[in-house]
Structures are given as C-alpha cells and as structure tokens.
Regions:
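Catalytic cores of nucleotide-sugar-dependent glycosyltransferases that transfer UDP/GDP/TDP-activated
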Residues: 1-264
Length: 264
C-alpha cells in the first residue's frame, strides 16, 4: 500500500528456489514519461551520457531507476537507522538504481557486479581479439564504433560510484580495469547450489515434462503435428550470436540436417 501511494507498481511473492526468498517484481513503465527529467538529473549529478541511448538502453536504465526507488521505499518503511542495508546491482542494466540510491539514500551500501563488460561483449561478438589486443583498445573509440556510448557510460559510472565493485572472474577483472578504468574490489566467482539441478530420481520426470513442452512449442511454430519420437535440439541463453555460440549451434544443425545416416 505504501509503495502504491508513492506511485510504485510492484508485486511481491516468493521465488521458487531453495529457501523461497521474497521477490519484488518492479514495473518501470510508469517512469517512461519522466525519462528526460530522470536522465537530465543523472547528467547533472554524475555526467551520465544518455543522449544517444536508444530503447535498448532507456528501458533497462528506467528499470534500474524504478528498482532503486523501490529499495528506497522499502528501507524507509521497513528498517531502522541502526540497520545496515546493502543493495547489490548486477550488470549495467541496473546501474541507474545504484546511482539513484547514491544521491537519495547514501546510507545504503551499494555493490555493483559485472559478469562481463559492455565493450568486452562487443569486441568478442564481432570476432575481434579481446584479451590479446586489449591494451590497444581505446574505450571511448570502441563505444562510438559499436554505438554503445550510453551503455558504456552507465556501466563505467556505476562502477566508479559503487561502494564496492566486483566481478565474477579474474579474466573479467582485467576487462573492468581497462574498459572501465576501475580495478575491482573483489572477485566473486559464480556459483550454483546443488539443488539447482534435479536429483537423479527427479531427472527423468523433468526430462519428459521438458520434452512435452518442446513438442508443444514446435507444433505451435510449425503449425502442424510433430511426431512423438522427433529429434529435438534446443538452445537457450542471452542473445549474443557469437559469444553464446548460436552461430556454432546453427552450423551444427546444418551438418546434422545433411547427414542421411541419422534416421530422423
């Protein structure tokens, strides 16, 4: 109710993973009409360069801003001045939330974590050598070349404004130091709880359920029945054509398609 009174649209529930943590879903759409004022404020406070950002920048930035507003509201309504609050922001897409809290609620400790860098993804995704030639890349020139000036600006600004700056590996730490001009404070490796993967007893049931869903999707896309014993191959993940191996996957599918000995 308090959030709604403040113009924040949220849904609260439980995340269906181990521990069932509380999750707040944030609707950023109410801030779209205020985007110019929001980005102007960030320029005045941090020199965040949003002027060339398109909607693939605007929407994530507004989501981050909305998340920052929700955190601010939650802290004001649910915590005391004696409590120590930490907010962790992952990737440039949430960086605007960190910047908002730094000015609106500086008592909240802000951690910024990158899993790669904007420029690193661009370089690797365009078949250019990343680590062997990194020292020769000028970040500002790369940002202009790949039209990611605003994304790079938000990532770099968040890294510099964070109370603690982290990344997930030593190799991405070298990216951060060069492209963001900021050494990380800590390397925090990715990790997965054992419960994230099904037990041996559950595996077959989940495999069957997944296959049934695949068949439903295939039939909906093709507009015709698909045989129950059809060979199904799938890929998932962030849409980065080369970085995530989608090009290799398509080439492999092409080779299989030309193989007359498969029997499928």
């Amino acid at each position: 109710q308090r959030a709604a009174q403040e113009g924040l649209r949220i849904k609260v529930g439980r995340w269906n993973v181990a521990g069932k943590p509380i999750v707040i879903l944030v609707d950023f759409s109410t801030f779209i009409t205020q985007k110019d004022e929001i980005f102007a404020s960030f320029w005045e406070k941090y020199k965040l360069d949003s002027i060339s950002g398109q909607w693939d920048y605007i929407e994530p930035a507004l989501f981050g801003y909305a998340a920052g507003k929700v955190i601010e509201s939650f802290v004001r309504f649910n915590s005391s001045i004696r409590q120590r609050i930490i907010a962790q922001f992952h990737e440039w897409m949430t960086g605007a939330g960190l910047l908002y809290l730094k000015s609106a609620m500086p008592q909240v400790g802000c951690v910024f974590t990158t899993h790669a860098t904007v420029l690193g993804r661009c370089v690797a995704g365009n078949n250019l050598p990343l680590y062997s030639e990194m020292k020769n890349y000028v970040p500002e020139e790369l940002a202009r070349r790949f039209n990611v000036i605003s994304k790079q600006s938000l990532e770099k600004t968040a890294a510099h404004q964070a109370d603690c700056f982290t990344t997930v590996s030593e190799i991405t730490a070298t990216e951060c130091a060069h492209f963001l001009d900021k050494e990380v404070d800590l390397v925090t490796p990715n990790g997965f709880e054992n419960v994230f993967t099904p037990s041996e007893a559950e595996w077959e049931g989940k495999r069957k359920a997944g296959r049934e869903k695949f068949l439903q999707v295939a039939q909906a896309i093709l507009g015709r029945p698909v045989a129950e014993d059809a060979l199904i191959l799938g890929i998932s993940g962030r849409y980065e054509f080369k970085n995530k191996g989608i090009d290799v996957f398509i080439d492999a599918m092409g080779q299989l398609n030309r193989n007359n000995g498969l029997g499928k």
